[in-house]
Each structure stands twice: as structure tokens, then as C-alpha cells.
From Swiss-Prot:
One example GO MF annotation: protein-L-isoaspartate (D-aspartate) O-methyltransferase activity
Upper taxonomic lineage: Bacteria, Pseudomonadati, Bacteroidota, Flavobacteriia, Flavobacteriales
Keyword tags: Cytoplasm, Methyltransferase, S-adenosyl-L-methionine, Transferase
Protein name stated in the entry: Protein-L-isoaspartate O-methyltransferase
Function as written in the Swiss-Prot or TrEMBL entry: Catalyzes the methyl esterification of L-isoaspartyl residues in peptides and proteins that result from spontaneous decomposition of normal L-aspartyl and L-asparaginyl residues. It plays a role in the repair and/or degradation of damaged proteins.
HAMAP family assigned to the protein according to its UniProt record, in alphabetical order: PIMT
Broad class of enzyme this protein falls into: transferase
Catalytic reaction list: [protein]-L-isoaspartate + S-adenosyl-L-methionine = [protein]-L-isoaspartate alpha-methyl ester + S-adenosyl-L-homocysteine
Length: 213
């Protein structure tokens, strides 16, 4: 599959939709206008790639809808050079958005099939994550901690303590929390022991599975 002017036109329309839904961060909108989302999907979904929808990507996983990607990224308030941990690399689309807004991205994926596929795809598209790894997202990446931000792209029944421990003071963790539908939750680390919690509307995510490797 190629990236054509038609795809660019569809991306521009998607950016307009996201703006109408309340996304305002210019860097995020620019990233979404540039990243060829259709290349992260099975070719059978190509015609729908720039609709604001989630799609299956294999291994029981989905690529989140663009609004969710933009919303989570906006909550992190990523600055250029921020060290960001992503739990659930999946298709690599969220990874690409983070890289494009200037983050130094460390990403973990627990499905080997997706890990291999995405590890090959991102470099082909000129997207350079700092570190991609195969493993249990619940544990984070303690060897590379602390992080300015942590983004979790799968629903979790509760907030993993290991991830909270890997945040810098002042760092932000964005995670969908809940069993059936999830509440988008923002955790800000105030000091060694204090964390501030903010909750945003309901979202639907595949579950974050523990110890599945």
C-alpha cells in the first residue's frame, strides 16, 4: 500500500473531526495529519482508515480510534524530549503519534506477533522509537525509569503500582481504568508518596492482561 494525495485529503478531514470533538493541541493534530494510519491496518480496512473508529489488528487487539489516541496524548501534555513509556505498542500508531510530537518513546507489547510486526513497520515509515520491547506491560520498564509520562493503551481493572513507581515527580500517567467500560484516568505524581487523580469520560478498551508471556 502507498500513501497518496487521496489519503492526505482523508487525514485532513479526520483532523477537522477531531477538532470538532474538542482536540486543540496543534502538534497532535499535525501528527495525525501526517501519519499514514492506513498502513497500520490490514489492507481490507484501508477505505475506513481515516474514520474515527477502532479496528481489529490481530492477536485479539485493536487500533484505538484516533480521537482516543489524540485525547490520551493531549492529557500527557508531551514536551519535546520528554521520556514517555507506552504500555501496549499494538499497531504502533499511538507510538508514531508520540514520536511525531517529540517524545522519546519506550514501548512494551505483550503479543509477540504484534511486537514483531510493529518493530518492522515503524522504521520503514521513518518512525524511530527509542526502545521497543516484548513483555508484561504491568511491570513497566524499571530499568529505564523514571519517565516524564506513561500512557496505557489497554483497559486495566486498577492502576498498576509498578507504573506509578516509575513516574518522575511531576510526571503523568494516563490509563483507562475499569472492568467493562473504562474511565480515562490521569494520575499526576506530586512527590515520593503523593499522587493526584483526575477522571475523564467513559472509553472502551481491550483488557490489559497480566503475566501472559
Amino acid at each position: 500500500m502507498k500513501d497518496t494525495p487521496k489519503h492526505q485529503g482523508l487525514r485532513n478531514q479526520l483532523v477537522t473531526v477531531l477538532q470538532q470533538k474538542g482536540i486543540t493541541n496543534k502538534n497532535i493534530l499535525e501528527a495525525i495529519s501526517k501519519i499514514p494510519r492506513h498502513l497500520f491496518l490490514n489492507s481490507s480496512f484501508e477505505d475506513y482508515a481515516y474514520q474515527d473508529l477502532a479496528f481489529p489488528i490481530g492477536a485479539g487487539q485493536t487500533i484505538s480510534q484516533p480521537y482516543t489516541v489524540a485525547f490520551q496524548t493531549e492529557l500527557l501534555e508531551v514536551k519535546k524530549g520528554d521520556k514517555v513509556l507506552e504500555i501496549g505498542t499494538g499497531s504502533g500508531y499511538q507510538t508514531a503519534v508520540l514520536c511525531m510530537v517529540g517524545a522519546v518513546v519506550y514501548s512494551v507489547e505483550r503479543q509477540n506477533e504484534l511486537f514483531k510486526k510493529t518493530s518492522l513497520l515503524l522504521p520503514k515509515l521513518g518512525i524511530r522509537a527509542k526502545h521497543l520491547s516484548f513483555g508484561d506491560g504491568y511491570k513497566g520498564l524499571p530499568n529505564y525509569a523514571p519517565f516524564d509520562s506513561i500512557i496505557v493503551t489497554a483497559g486495566a481493572p486498577e492502576i498498576p503500582k509498578a507504573l506509578m513507581a516509575q513516574l518522575k515527580i511531576g510526571g503523568k500517567l494516563v490509563i483507562p481504568v475499569g472492568e467493562n467500560s473504562q474511565i480515562m484516568t490521569l494520575i499526576i505524581r506530586k512527590d515520593e508518596t503523593q499522587f493526584e487523580k483526575h477522571e475523564f469520560g467513559d472509553f472502551k478498551f481491550v483488557p490489559l492482561l497480566e503475566d501472559k508471556n
